[in-house]
């Protein structure tokens, strides 16, 4: 993983989805023919994403620029295969073979990471456990709509508190695949959008699987950060449901220790960095880029930086309630 200075530069250059396209809602309040509850429909969505053979062409609205990508997914012999391909500009591929994900980019050497799924460009809610999230989120049916010439059911995923963002998802009535997701802030401003414009399913593994099986693996890259002993600082306040997933220790180019801890509630994530390096006071403050918030503050002669998918007010409270 990138060290903190590099990570901040990367995130500041990164883009996020924030514009809504063709957001017309049909005045059809009827629920799906199979009469699933909102929570059952969300569970059916995550199951369909993992168990069907399918291919999607979808659009990301990236800082006002639309980018089209193709995603293909298949199961064969109980192994997962997937491929994400850019359809505009320079061709880039991400290929999954079971628990290995390889990146192919003409500008850098190809490499492989150990992962259970491709995380790039896909909404994180596809990997969520909605039975667990029901304790902290409300799931509400919003009626029917039409996406990619398919009838869909709309469901709002809204936190029970006001410390997180919320989603509106559009789920295909027949296959239960996700065809659109809108990530919104507390005021309903669109931060991020995933929108399918064409898709197909198959009863058998898709043809791309055969070529993927023959493709040599690029070198495997491991996380070189250490899970070493960190300082005794702790977060005195967190929104309900968030818990620490891991912690690491590394050093920057100047030899300063950088401790990090990663937190998730199962839908949204953030990471806290505590560094011994001296930060310019002018760099304190917040930056929101799409759904990603960066909040920095100097405390106890240390740099504290939070990076994650949280409202600025929530990020500020978490950092300011940190205790050494």
Segments (PLM) and residue ranges:
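Short, surface-exposed beta-strand-loop junctions and turns on beta-sheet-rich folds
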Residues: 88-90, 109-111, 186-187, 278-279, ...
């Amino acid at each position: 993983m990138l060290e903190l200075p590099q990570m901040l530069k990367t995130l500041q250059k990164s883009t996020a989805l924030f514009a809504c396209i063709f957001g017309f809602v049909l005045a059809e309040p009827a629920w799906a023919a199979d009469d699933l509850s909102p929570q059952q429909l969300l569970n059916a969505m995550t199951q369909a994403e993992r168990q069907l053979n399918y291919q999607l062409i979808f659009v990301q609205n990236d800082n006002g620029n639309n980018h089209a990508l193709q995603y293909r997914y298949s199961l064969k012999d109980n192994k997962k295969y997937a491929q994400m391909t850019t359809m505009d500009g320079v061709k880039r591929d991400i290929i999954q073979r079971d628990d290995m994900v390889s990146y192919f980019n003409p500008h850098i050497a190809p490499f492989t990471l150990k992962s259970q799924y491709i995380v790039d460009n896909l909404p994180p809610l596809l990997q969520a456990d909605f039975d667990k999230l029901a304790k902290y989120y409300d799931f509400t049916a919003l009626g029917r709509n039409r996406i990619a010439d398919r009838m869909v059911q709309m469901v709002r995923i809204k936190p029970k508190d006001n410390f997180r963002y919320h989603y509106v998802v559009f789920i295909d009535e027949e296959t239960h695949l996700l065809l659109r997701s809108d990530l919104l802030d507390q005021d309903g401003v669109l931060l991020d959008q995933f929108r399918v414009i064409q898709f197909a399913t198959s009863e058998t593994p898709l043809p791309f699987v055969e070529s993927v099986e023959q493709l040599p693996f690029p070198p495997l890259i491991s996380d070189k950060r250490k899970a070493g002993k960190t300082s005794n600082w702790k977060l005195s306040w967190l929104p309900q449901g968030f818990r620490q997933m891991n912690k690491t220790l590394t050093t920057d180019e100047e030899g300063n220790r950088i401790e990090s801890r990663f937190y998730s509630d199962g839908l949204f994530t953030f990471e806290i960095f505590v560094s011994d390096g001296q930060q310019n006071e002018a760099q304190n403050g917040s930056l929101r880029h799409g759904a990603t918030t960066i909040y920095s503050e100097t405390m106890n002669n240390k740099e504290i930086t939070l990076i994650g998918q949280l409202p600025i007010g929530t990020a500020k409270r978490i950092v300011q309630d940190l205790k050494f």
